[in-house]
Amino acid sequence: MPANNNKAPSASSKRRSIRFVFYFLSFMLIVGVLVGCSSSPYQPLSPQLTSKKQNESKEDLGDEGKPLPAPIRQEHSQWIPVPWSSLPGFDQDRLHEAWNAWLKSCQKPVPLIGDLCLDVRRLSISDGLEQRKWIVSRFQAYKVENLSSNAVGMLTAYYEPELKAHREASDTFSIPLYGVPYGVKAGSLWHTREAMETNTGAMEQLKGHEIVYVADAVDALILQIQGSGRVEVTEPDGTIHWIRLAFAATNNQPYQSVTRWLLDNTEWREFSWPGIKKWASNNQNRVREMLWSNPRVVFFREEPLSNSDDHNGPRGAEGVSLTPGRSIAVDPKSIPYGTPVWLVSEGSNVKLRKLVMAQDTGSAIVGAVRADYFAGSGSEAGEFAGRIKQDLQLWVLWPNNKQP
């Protein structure tokens, strides 16, 4: 057998090889660190924007090469045309939820937008992709600004309170809620809240217009501020059923917040409704004074409630029932009733990016970028509504080649 002439590696040569590998790996590690330091750190996208990551392409939204029309001016706002790709989260919304609210607006179609109601009804059984494509093809998006070109406004929320009442007054249920009394006329001042409790003539005019009696004066005020409510009524014969007290009219007096009175006249600083009720329970001798600081009173009309009304709110100013989470109150001098609106509001309490319908208004809802978000009925909706006061952006969706 021939001998093997190759020498076995010495210990020193092994050490040299190991040192070479160590130096090489150290060099590569240093290079890697330097390269990493020169790069921007990875920033995860917002969860609202990562889903379907950029399936929201310009092609999908019909923006490619599409010229923008001229701005549109309203009495309290201006609408600036923008590409669909500029609407935050437009490809993420569950449009079928908004479609129910849109169908309600089609019950009382307004000019121009109402002309598209046949398509709205046809698409009610389509998926969100088909609905989105139709919106993009038939509408132009406009960013809403005030007349000074400010596009950021304020979002609040409202809801339908639920409370118990009796048809007849008692020691416990003694606070009346009224229908429209004689002499109340649109645009004309009527008696203040204080006068309704102290003026003989005002009290005479109110007689016979009591609808129900509630147990708590602050609950009555909340119901008036929200504009409507669901009431569990006990009748004189003991039967119990639900009714809706819907907005009918006001005394046309200016609205003043009771929180302003508390701020100016007490040390109390818990301005949520539970906080205000807590103050009232501890200061019964001053409750009337607090309530009288707001001279505005709302009058109601009674409406029956059925099982089908569980998912429907009260009728808004457009004349159709409101949809929780999909109806907003607006200034009609900024945005017409029945208009589809893309709403974006991001605060510490909630983030909203969704299609809503302009279906209501309110005395405090004035200005270009101003909306009141209908949260639904009951205590959970009330708790949500009480937390919402945050920045707002709005985009009007208006039919192509049409002027309001």
Which residues are covered by each model-predicted region?
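Secretory/export targeting leaders with adjacent low-complexity proregions
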Residues: 78-305, 309, 345
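A generic structural signal for short, non-catalytic loop/turn and secondary-structure boundary residues
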Residues: 77, 150-152, 224, 238, ...
